[in-house]
Swiss-Prot record:
Active site: C175 (cysteine persulfide intermediate)
Name by which UniProt lists this protein: tRNA uridine(34) hydroxylase
Physiological role: Catalyzes oxygen-dependent 5-hydroxyuridine (ho5U) modification at position 34 in tRNAs.
SMART domains: RHOD
Biological processes annotated in GO: tRNA modification
Pfam families: Rhodanese (PF00581), UPF0176_N (PF17773)
Gene3D superfamilies for the chain: 3.30.70.100, Rhodanese-like domain (3.40.250.10)
Organism of provenance: Ruegeria pomeroyi (strain ATCC 700808 / DSM 15171 / DSS-3)
UniProt catalytic activity: uridine(34) in tRNA + AH2 + O2 = 5-hydroxyuridine(34) in tRNA + A + H2O
């Protein structure tokens, strides 16, 4: 059984590059795999491995400057969620492209999962999903507004174009684990919105703590590992990835004429050129050859 830990923490690292070697070495030594992002504004990522290995890595992160109160969310999987370990240096741990946004200064009001339903059912509350379009497509909260953004960078422009619709409304926001809402609520407060709320622990904590019979969640929640999606109780969902576009699809979508394993699906068939598809086919060939030799291929990670 693999323990999965999803974490983020906003702090201030003087030089993130100095932190990378020891963190990566520890993960490798402990058999932990996944991706961790380091930036001057903090750390973000998801890792998986044996219980003892995850505990060791979390203890190391909590000992980093300003990270003693690190929080994380856990789940389990009976198969490895990641193929390798990566520690990457970034400009932002979640990219919004707004230099003035600083969640350490202030964020919206945190709302516990058990109080979320009452808030979003209020007539004076507008509910906004801050995730990307392909994530929203497989599940969201009842009544939520989908900004239809392709990346989190698009959110500020969407807000600027639509903010008059929400005049005199309280704004409630949510995302997968909470990190995007740390920035989006700070951004809205900076734009003069007075009453801003966000779901503490994100969708994942809601699905873990709120029983399905009391839930206002509809569908599955996309996750950034080999589980692809989870439902109530964080039970692994039916979705899988199209490795041509990295979007979630259902098993029955593999029966569509547009589907070619590792190359295309009904969502991306018209988005790539024939040259792209030839490259994807060659990639799949190399993956198959590597597996036949009992090796991992980088494209599978």
């Amino acid at each position: 059984m693999y323990t999965i830990a999803a974490l983020y923490h906003f702090t201030r690292f003087a030089d993130p590059a100095d932190l990378k070697p020891a963190l990566l070495d520890l993960c490798l030594a402990q058999g932990v795999k996944g991706t961790l992002l380091l930036a001057k504004e903090g750390i973000n990522g998801t890792i998986a491995g044996p219980r003892a290995g995850i505990d060791a890595v979390l203890a190391h992160i909590r000992a980093l400057p300003g990270c003693s109160d690190l929080e994380w969310k856990e789940a389990t999987s009976d198969h490895p969620p990641f193929g390798k370990m990566k520690v990457r240096l970034k400009q932002e741990i979640v990219t919004m492209g707004q230099p003035d946004v600083d969640p350490r200064a202030r964020v919206g009001h945190y709302v516990e999962p058990e109080d979320w339903n009452d808030l979003i059912r209020s007539d004076d509350v507008v509910l906004i999903d801050t995730r990307n379009d392909y994530e929203v497509a497989i599940g969201t909260f009842e009544g939520a507004i989908d900004p239809m953004t392709e990346s989190f960078r698009d959110f500020p422009a969407w807000w600027e174009a639509n903010k008059e619709r929400f005049h005199n409304k309280r704004v409630a926001m949510f995302c997968t684990g909470g990190i995007r809402c740390e920035k989006s609520t700070n951004y809205l407060l900076g734009q003069g919105v007075e009453d801003v709320y966000h779901l503490k622990g994100g969708i994942l904590r809601y699905l873990e703590e709120v029983p399905a019979e009391n839930s206002t969640w509809q569908g599955e929640c996309f996750v950034f590992d080999n589980r692809v999606s989870v439902g109530h109780g964080l039970v692994e969902g039916p979705h899988e990835l199209c490795h041509g576009c990295r979007r979630p699809i259902l098993p029955e979508d593999r029966n569509r004429p547009e589907y070619e394993h590792g190359v295309s699906c009904h969502l991306c068939i018209d988005e790539t050129s024939e040259a792209d598809k030839m490259r994807f086919r060659e990639r799949q060939k190399q993956i198959a050859l590597a597996r036949a030799r009992g090796e991992d291929h980088l494209a599978t990670h």
